Structure formats: C-alpha cells, structure tokens
Amino acid sequence: MAKDVKPTRKNLMQIEDRIELSERGHDTLEKKRDGLIMEFMDILDQAQDVREDLDGSYERAQRAINMARAMEGDVAVRGAAAALKEHPELTTQSKNIMGVVVPQIESSKVRKSLDERGYGVMGTSARIDEAAEAYEELLENIILAAEVETAMKKMLEEIETTKRRVNALEFKLLPDLYDNQEYIEQKLEEQEREEIFRMKKIKAKKEEEEDALAAEEEAEEEPEAVTADD
C-alpha cells in the first residue's frame, strides 16, 4: 500500500492527521468495548438469576397443574382456563445502554384476583386457584426473561461490532498508515540527501571554475610584470 502513496510533505501531513484521528478513534472504541463488556456481564448475572426463577416457576406451575388435573379432572381445568376474559397486556419501551437500544417490556393484568379470572369461585377448588397463580408467576418470569435475553443479544452484537472496528483499526488501518508514514519519511530523507549532495557538487564545480578563472587571470598578469622589469 505504501508504494501507492506519493512521497510528498503534503501527503505526509495528511497521513499524520489520519494517524492522530485513527488513534483517538481506536482509544474511544476500546473504552466503549470495555464498557459494553462490563454492562454485558451485569446483564448476564441478571439473566442467570432470571433463568433460575423461570425454571423454578415452570416446575411449580407443572406441579400445580398436574395436581389440579388429578384432583379436579381435565374438564374442570380446561373450563377454568376457558373462562378467562381479560388477557395480559404488554407494552414495549426502550432504554439506551452505551448507545445500544434495548427493550423494556411492561406487563399488566398478568396477576389476577379470583373475580378477574372469570371462573366462579363456587365451582372450582383451591387447586385450580393455585395452578392459576403458578402460571401467572410463570408468565411474568417469561416476560422478564424475554426482556433480559433480548438485551443480552443486542449487547453482544454491539460488542462484536465494536471489537471488529477496534481490530480493523489496530491490525489493518493503523499499520498501513504507519507504513505509509515511514515510507514517505524515508523517501523525503533520501530526496533531502540527494539535494544536499547535488548542491555540494554544484558548489564544488563553481569553486573549481572560480579557481580556474583565478589561475588564468594570474597567468595573464605574469608576462606584463616581466616586461615592466625589462
């Protein structure tokens, strides 16, 4: 790449400016990458807790529904589920984490009272109520897990993008610029040495010509001096 650059002082100044800008950009991206990794680790810790809660609530919901089916029968359980009139509502917002937009999911009407579940209190048992509560808890944890894991995915994508940009600067662009800078500096030094050598030759030649001219003038003056003595 360096051979494609003309070795001029103007190009050298432009490359030095690009190096300065690229080095600042590299430092900024490194700080961003490190900050993103720290944020990602915090979200990862949160995700592990959420995943444990989700697994636990799933097991509780399964036990509760199995118990309700065993005690009340599938028909009663399906009837209670079909009686639900108000379904959960979800709204999504967003927040910014170091330039990464991640979702925030707000849920409502997930947890319900006995009346809100739609089935008659007199026609069901506590086992069905326990199963309903367990699945409401499970749904809340599913929503939270979806939010956290989506944030993790977006953060990880941004980390990888930032890493690629850091590596492109560190291992491609900056080395090429340094090579170009070194190439131009070497060529300019060669040109300067050649110019100094050329000027010395001109000076030496001029001195030789001046010495020769002085010798000729001196030779012309000597016969005149001899004639005057005679």
From Swiss-Prot:
Assign the protein's first listed, main location to one coarse class: membrane
Q: Does the keyword Phosphoprotein apply?
A: no
Q: Name one GO biological process term.
A: proton motive force-driven plasma membrane ATP synthesis
InterPro entries in the record, alphabetically? V_ATPase_D (IPR002699)
Q: GO CC terms for this protein?
A: plasma membrane
Report keywords, A-Z: ATP synthesis, Cell membrane, Hydrogen ion transport, Ion transport, Membrane, Transport
Q: Which cysteines are joined by disulfide bonds?
A: none
- Which domain of life, per UniProt? Archaea
Ranges for the region named Disordered are 204-230
What is the recorded membrane topology of this protein? Peripheral membrane protein
Subcellular localization is given as:
Cell membrane
Pfam short name (any one): ATP-synt_D
GO MF terms held by the record: ATP binding; proton-transporting ATP synthase activity, rotational mechanism; proton-transporting ATPase activity, rotational mechanism
**Residue ranges under compositional bias (Acidic residues)?**
208-230
Keyword Phosphoprotein assigned to the entry: answer is: no
Under the heading HAMAP family, the entry gives: ATP_synth_D_arch (MF_00271)
Family per record: Belongs to the V-ATPase D subunit family.
| Task performed by this protein | Component of the A-type ATP synthase that produces ATP from ADP in the presence of a proton gradient across the membrane.
Subunit-level organization: Has multiple subunits with at least A(3), B(3), C, D, E, F, H, I and proteolipid K(x).
Instruction: Name it.
Output: A-type ATP synthase subunit D
- List the source organism: Haloarcula marismortui (strain ATCC 43049 / DSM 3752 / JCM 8966 / VKM B-1809)
- Species lineage: Archaea, Methanobacteriati, Methanobacteriota, Stenosarchaea group, Halobacteria
